[in-house]
């Protein structure tokens, strides 16, 4: 039995089939009062209850008089509970569709406004990381619609989906009110609380589904906007042919500064060394230590040895000029020493690609110790070819690397042109190598006086002797470690009882002659 009270409504029982006859409103029934008759399963008697006009008073229910037949047609038998539920579901569905359309229009307007305010991402950003520049919160920040939502036919029409057809309670989830135009077109129907209570279990799920659908729509609009921006950037011609072009003035400035800063470091590897031997007056000890530590670059240099018996060669001067006042000329013809400083960093000289950039005191003598392995060991150095040396041949006495004016003449070393990243290398004669090896077996470290005397006897510079001893000690260490590794592997393979002693490193002077 369905009991309807003026203050509240409780559902105590429903018939299995909602086929109760409907009572049309008569002329003696006051407007706003509704009489509902239902059959009871216990007594079988019909009981009617008159409701006051305060419970179901709305703009539509007050028009149920015989003089207003349009109200009856719009509500389609309002006295039936099934008709009430159906009408309520249709009304909530229309409100939900309008709400979704408003959200979509607001999101599209916010996305267009955000794209107009913020410029597209820089070219240095990767394509996969462009999603981090936008977010749903930024898209939903401005919720003011630009155009009135008057397109009611664009909403989702799938009535089988629970998210679209489930009614939403106006008490638990309050959607934003529609604009005035939409409110004027759709009448605001107020339904009986029984219809709302009948579907209370679906309210929370419908609200969650609607929120998820709105978020999905926002993400789809965002992805479409980003795809359009990516297509526009892909169709535009690139500003430069570099892998990471700079599209902003700040990026261009940073790129130019990086190029200028990296140019001396790149070209310093293949700078030719003429007779500029007093470089210690210009370059500090830090550059010398950096070149000594860079042993990987020491093995890519070749230097020619000039005639050691020519005693009448002109003396070198600190500015890189010989006695006749002529500067050393490379095969490409660099300018004289007076104009060298201004020509080094000029754009034309840098564009040519073959102007020497700042020769270092260590570049010509960096790999002096590894040269004898190709000559005395019987293994030729790969990539070497005979080319005529350039520059005035002869010996140069006087102030060299760390020497004074009282030292005897030394060997003049000139660069042979190979490839841009190749550094000069000093090939020693067989007699010099034998003397160096003999001295190394006697003493691995030379004092300053011993090094000066020994270099004078071999007609080498002190720097050449010093670097040769450094590389020879490194080679002896590598050979010693390789020999120890062989002993360890042999002991472990045999499983000898003394294998634990083979694991400990040891040093024996007899290993120094290997090589």
UniProtKB/Swiss-Prot annotation:
> Which PANTHER family does the entry link to?
HOMEOBOX PROTEIN MSX (PTHR24338), MUSCLE SEGMENTATION HOMEOBOX (PTHR24338:SF0)
According to the UniProt entry, its GO molecular function terms are: DNA-binding transcription factor activity, RNA polymerase II-specific; RNA polymerase II transcription regulatory region sequence-specific DNA binding; sequence-specific DNA binding
Region annotation (Disordered) maps to 1-76, 90-113, 142-185, 214-279, 307-342
Which Pfam families does the record match to this protein?
A: Homeodomain
For this protein, the record's Gene3D superfamilies field holds: Homeodomain-like
What species does this protein belong to?
Answer: Drosophila melanogaster
Query: InterPro entries per the record?
Result: HD (IPR001356), HD_metazoa (IPR020479), Homeobox_CS (IPR017970), Homeodomain-like_sf (IPR009057), Msh_Homeobox_Regulators (IPR050674)
Q: Which domain of life is it from?
A: Eukaryota
Q: What is its main location?
A: nucleus
Q: Which family does it belong to?
A: Belongs to the Msh homeobox family.
* UniProt-recorded name of the protein: Muscle segmentation homeobox
Tissue expression, per UniProt? Dorsal lateral ectoderm, developing central and peripheral nervous systems and the somatic mesoderm. Expressed in dorsal and lateral muscle preclusters and mesodermal fat body precursors.
* Chain's role: Plays a key role in the specification of proneural and promuscular cluster formation. Required for the specification of dorsal and lateral muscle progenitor cells. Regulates development of peripheral nervous system derived from lateral neuroblasts.
Annotation: DNA-binding region: 421-480
Q: Which GO terms describe its cellular component?
A: nucleus
